[in-house]
Amino acid sequence: MKTLIGVCMAAMALIGNGCMGNAKHAETVSGGTTDSLYLLVGSYARAQEEGIRVYVFNQETGKGTFRSGLSGISNPSFLTPSVDGSRVYAVGEDEGISSTANALSFDREKGMLSFINSQPTHGGAPCNITLSPKEDYVLTANYMGGNVTVFPLGSRGELLEGDTLVFTGSGPDKERQSQPHLHCVLFTPDGRLLLANDLGTDRIHAFPVSEKKGEELLDRAASYDVQLAPGAGPRHTCFAPDGKHAYLITELSGDVIVLSYDEMKLDTIQTIKADTLDARGSADIHISPDGNFVYASNRLKGDGIAIFSVNSEDGTLEKAGYQPTGIHPRNFAITPNGKYLLVACRDTNEIQIFARDAETGLLQDTGEKIEMSKPVCLKFVPMDRE
């Protein structure tokens, strides 16, 4: 693999009902409106617990109501939905051979998930999952396995046997970077590259997507690496709405790296601090729907959300503020209308709901929260309309 200088990644997702175990149906919500969404929440939980929960969330009032829960998956810590929301894919984040990827169907009328099938990831601790642009493959980033698994999908959306992409190398941090640690997989907005963030080797592995029918999804021979600063620890990435810039959060150095993206090439144009306390626990990153503000979460010290304004000319960032949160904000999500930012606080067992000022980008705690054990992934899915 040839090496470039730069960086990248992003992500998106949603979810579904039913299970290997059982799905419980709570109260129904009548007459869905354009203000109502499904909020799908992944968590750290035992298989016999409802590790995935479905809520109805009103993005005008900022209030959520429990709809249903799904058991049967151990540690469903990350979810991704199909574009139409009818299918959801979830990791089963165990560290050994029991690690899985799971296919679910989602009944948007009832707000219920049901289990389709499961496949082993052949790599421990899968922590991120994504769908290919044509929604004919699912890929997992396996943190302890140090690899990526590529699953073809069958006609029902079921997972077929997966194939692995194996990586080598290490980084300067002997405790955190003794081997490859894949933390995020996602496709560029134009669908031409798969980007795999490797926290263990300070690289983004980039794979062109094959364009010819009958070929494998990825052109492995044309793959290359984007090399980052030693000890950075790349974690998650998001793209601007126009697809011209990417924003990468590094877990260990606590930076947001701004990259330009053009013709399958990434170039670093700015590095700015999100974690000023050297907590080495930066986690998630998202951009507002209007593209004007970037938000990044920090854990371990000074738990909260760093807020940056975006320069509309060149995509660079300027610090705009900081919002304290509950403990261990591993993941967060912004409502499609941009009015609210929801934070999954793993160690305070709650989803905090913040109102977002569209002019300043700043957040205000509404006092509303959803109590749930160890929430770590939030995805919105539109409700079906009658």
What are these regions (language model features)?
Residues M1-S36:
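Bacterial Sec-dependent N-terminal signal peptides
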Residues K24-N58:
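An edge-strand/N-cap motif at the start of beta-rich repeat modules
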Residues Y44-R46, E93-E95, Y143, L153, ...:
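Short loop/turn segments immediately following the C-termini of beta-strands
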Residues Q48, I73-D84, H122-P133, Y137, ...:
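Beta-rich, blade/repeat-based domains predominating
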Residues V56-G62, L104-M112, V150-L160, F207-L217, ...:
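Short loop/turn segments immediately following beta-strands, especially the blade-tip
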Residues T65-E135:
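Blade-loop segments of beta-propeller domains
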Residues T65-S71, S114-P120, D163, G169-R176, ...:
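A short beta-strand motif characteristic of beta-propeller blades
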